[in-house]
Curated annotation (Swiss-Prot):
HAMAP family, alphabetized: Ribosomal_uL13
Pfam families recorded: Ribosomal_L13
PROSITE patterns cross-referenced by the UniProt entry: RIBOSOMAL_L13
GO molecular function, one term: structural constituent of ribosome
NCBIfam families: rplM_bact
Protein family (similarity comment): Belongs to the universal ribosomal protein uL13 family.
The protein's name in its UniProt record: Large ribosomal subunit protein uL13
Keyword Ribonucleoprotein belongs to the record: yes
Annotated organism of origin: Syntrophus aciditrophicus (strain SB)
Function: This protein is one of the early assembly proteins of the 50S ribosomal subunit, although it is not seen to bind rRNA by itself. It is important during the early stages of 50S assembly.
Length: 142
């Protein structure tokens, strides 16, 4: 008997809705990454994108534990000499809370083209409104 390997065309994809209000960032991000990879499915195959679509609302109301709002620093580089920029998690949560969750999930996915394709299935919104009612996402309790 041959080992089953899923094909991209045979994978049934679901849409899930997650309410981030009161959820801890890291715990929520790890569950989102698991669902984006498809590891919760019996037909999971490491080299095939078997994951589902995830819509996250209320990203501005998620929780960072401890002193992370003050102490956690996000870095990026402009590409120019002396262009290393940094922001605290508190400032990021004020300006763009969607990026905080997006970066946390990005760090938990594979660092290759498959990981980038998985990340495109993540839709994050700061408020309660989203544009995916037509897909009828199922509410995913965490």
């Amino acid at each position: 008997m041959k080992t089953y390997q899923a094909k991209e065309s045979e994978v049934a994809r679901e849409w899930y809705l997650i309410d981030a209000e009161g959820q801890v960032l890291g715990r929520m991000a790890s569950e989102i990454a698991r669902r984006l990879r498809g590891k919760h499915k019996p037909e999971y195959t490491p080299h095939v994108d078997t994951g589902d679509f995830i819509v996250v609302v209320n990203a501005e109301k998620m929780v960072l534990t401890g002193k992370k709002l003050r102490d956690k620093i996000y870095y990026h580089h402009s590409g120019y000499p002396g262009g290393l920029k940094e922001k605290t998690a508190g400032k990021m949560m004020q300006e763009k809370p969607t990026d905080v969750l997006w970066l946390a999930v990005k760090g938990m996915l594979p660092k290759n083209s498959l990981g980038r394709r998985m990340l495109r299935k993540l839709k994050v919104y700061a408020g309660n409104d989203h544009r995916h009612e037509a897909q009828c996402p199922k509410v995913l309790p965490l």
